[in-house]
């Protein structure tokens, strides 16, 4: 059973994934690398996902151990704190 407080965060994650898909539809690697607007949009949504993951209950995260929750959260931290070292 899902923790009722998890639902808003799960919605944020799904919305962010949908936005990344929308922003990158028809965009190949080369176009992504030369389009800062798309990069910024994708990076922002990855940060949203990472923050939402941090707020999910331990119960939910434990229920799905195959999902690398900590890696997702760390990606958010990397994007926030080491922004100038990011290589897209």
Task: Tell me the role of every PLM-derived stretch.
Residues 1-88:
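Solvent-exposed interaction patches of small proteins and small membrane subunits
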């Amino acid at each position: 059973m899902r923790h009722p407080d998890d639902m808003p965060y799960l919605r944020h994650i799904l919305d962010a994934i949908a936005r990344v898909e929308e922003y990158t539809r028809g965009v190949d690697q080369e176009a992504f690398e030369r389009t800062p607007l798309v990069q910024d949009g994708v990076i922002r949504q990855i940060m949203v996902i990472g923050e939402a993951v941090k707020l999910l209950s331990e119960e939910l995260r434990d229920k799905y151990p195959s999902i690398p929750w900590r890696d997702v959260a760390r990606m958010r931290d990397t994007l926030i704190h080491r922004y100038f070292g990011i290589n897209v």
